Amino acid sequence: MADKKNLLLLFDHPTEPVFMDKGGNGTVFDVPDSYVTDRYNQMCKKVQRRVSSASEKNVQVKEIAIPDLSCSMRLGRSEQFSIFLKSHRKMASHLIEIFTKMQTVDELQSVAVYARDRVNPVLFNYALSVALLHRPDTKDLELPAFAQTFPDRFIDSKMLRSMREESFVVERSAARLPVVSSVKYTASDLDVEHRLWYFREDLGVNLHHWHWHLVYPIEAPDRSIVDKDRRGELFYYMHQQIIARYNAERLSNHMARVQPFNNLDEPIAEGYFPKMDSLVASRAYPPRFDNTRLSDVDRPNNQLRVGIDDMKRWRERIYEAIHQGYVLDTNNEKIVLDDAKGIDILGNIIEASDLTPNSTLYGDFHNMGHILIAYSHDPTNKHLEYAGVMGDASTAMRDPIFYKWHAFIDNMFQEHKRLLSPYEKQELSFPDVRVESIQVESQGQVNRLTTFWQESDVDMSRGLDFVPRGHVLARFTHLQHHEFSYTIKVENSSEATRYGYVRIFLAPKLDDRNAPMLLEQQRLMMVELDKFVVTMPPGSHTITRNSTESSVTIPFERTFRNLDKLEELQNFLCGCGWPQHMLIPKGRPEGLRFELFVMVSNYEEDKVDQTVADCGCSIAASYCGLRDRLYPDRKSMGFPFDRKPRRGSEILENFLTPNMCAVEVIITHEDRTEKLREVPARS
């Protein structure tokens, strides 16, 4: 029986033939002759003998009858794959179906080995990843980070060349020096948007977006892979939180909040020049110049034809449905957009996933927005150019237009939310429970948090093809903060033990004009920091919680990790979650004022009846849910800030009920870099 961990080796060196050595210990797949592509048929055995002599392990591949892969092979090996393109999703869905229907790990390994050299490498990575995440016999595997198999999505072409040079020239991997990523490679300080390079180009932020779309694919052969609990609402909330976090960073850099891209006829003011090469396509990601206008896209090779008028029509129909309070399914039956399920239905319509009740009527709005922008430089394929970074889930967040587009998408969701009745005091209160105070402490300072720059290394060797083996480190500079802890004082004045759900949010106190924020504005900038359950016997209690325990984030080591020490991370199998080092905004050198909000709600009302102890993932559930489980909170995502405030609660102070508390917190940024000192010797 095959060792299922060998399946992970198929992600290594994605453009090299499958019979080449894989993994840190030089594992070789013993590939049947019939599985070798025509190109390598004559030399495969000769190469394998050479490679096998230095390898530590050989993996026998069982020869089986291979299913028809022709659908998934329609996309060329050197073309660009995009989950936003329906034709590409169909190809991926076909391959996912083949992978998930294999009866045993042996059969899965055989068909994956066969497919690997025949289908597009990125499509293969996506399909195998989705299959492994959802097969009962492989869902506990630790998937390699996408950055370590496709480093070209995360570093510029100059750095990629330097890494190849380091790998080729310095034979002994222990003597190789890290290749340092520049912080100024996409634009100069003349570009105001470049102040946010550390957010848009952050490794963990972009990995989060890619991994979220792996866990929540838009389309799949088995509806259960897509139809996860509150999937549409999660699409709304995860992206809403990205915009809230982005706006906090903009305020940290003396910039106005992002303006929604709500007029498709207007030019896109911001250009973007990614400076990245696609290893699969062997060409550069195309730039977008300032003031580029969107055009109808007609690219028959991608079975793609979508126009500005299509987008406007879909938008009007979605807004009409929101204002009417219902959508129509394919049988012309009404589906009510109620308080509980309405946002979930809208999420599946706007994205749009396989779960949309009527794709003919409401279209593919969000996905086609990505596509129109991604092909704005060559909408008719006249110049044979591939899509820009907005066409790829792993690169889209690098582009300033991503945030303007998603700010507009969020406005559509907020239109629905504003039509819902505000929460009244009795819906927000927790009888007999009072939050007396909250404070944060970091480095001995109370209610003061500090951010700074930090260097960290990522081993990207397994994404560098056709170069000598061994570790090749990329060194990134990223935002970091000192750890902090919450101290919450709560009183339970009843005579019974109560169970509370602690909800912690953070939002700027002043707007971009330095004026106090009204709650209707501020609630849209509330960033969720944590959510957890507490037990409160009668009396007074002090609750403490460390920032590293956040329900929003995945551990720092999950982003910056050693490829050969994955056993240390077996408790963090999902990989979906916001990066820990980006938990709080950057702040300013002089300090930026935020309001820290805590609410203790009634867990007996909020809890979902299920067991989560053995779900096999870190509990970064706020943005990603729980694998194979219901979302662990009955309340709407973003509660209590997902609706407009009740009358008389124009500011946060007036919104508070006894089970809530808020305090001012100052975030200060120190413009210094904590450098790594471990430098291998050249010998």
From Swiss-Prot:
- Looking at the record's lineage, which domain of life comes first? Eukaryota
Recorded E.C. number(s)? 1.14.18.1
Any idea which positions bind Cu cation B?
Answer: 366, 370, 406
- Modifications after synthesis and translation: Upon activation, a trypsin type protease cleaves prophenol oxidase to yield the active enzyme.
Write out the residues that bind Cu cation A. Answer: 209, 213, 239
As cofactor, the record names:
Cu(2+)
Recorded catalytic activity of this chain's protein: 2 L-dopa + O2 = 2 L-dopaquinone + 2 H2O; L-tyrosine + O2 = L-dopaquinone + H2O
Share an example GO biological-process annotation for this protein: dopamine metabolic process
Entry note: cofactor: Binds 2 copper ions per subunit.
Stretches of the chain forming a coiled coil according to its record: none
- Gene Ontology molecular function, alphabetical: catechol oxidase activity; metal ion binding; tyrosinase activity
- Active-site residues per Swiss-Prot or TrEMBL entry: 351
InterPro entries on file: Di-copper_centre_dom_sf, Hemocyanin/hexamerin, Hemocyanin/hexamerin_mid_dom, Hemocyanin_C, Hemocyanin_C_sf, Hemocyanin_N, Hemocyanin_N_sf, Ig_E-set
Extent of the signal sequence: none
Single GO cellular component term:
extracellular region
Which keywords belong to this entry?
A: Cleavage on pair of basic residues, Copper, Disulfide bond, Glycoprotein, Melanin biosynthesis, Metal-binding, Monooxygenase, Oxidoreductase, Secreted, Zymogen
Q: What main location does UniProt list?
A: secreted
> Which positions are glycosylated?
358, 492, 546
Broad enzyme group: oxidoreductase
Report residue numbers covered by any propeptide. 1-48
The UniProt similarity line reads: Belongs to the tyrosinase family.
* Name of the protein in its database record: Phenoloxidase 3
Task: Give the species this sequence originates from.
Answer: Drosophila melanogaster (Fruit fly)
Task: Report which gene this protein is encoded by.
Answer: PPO3
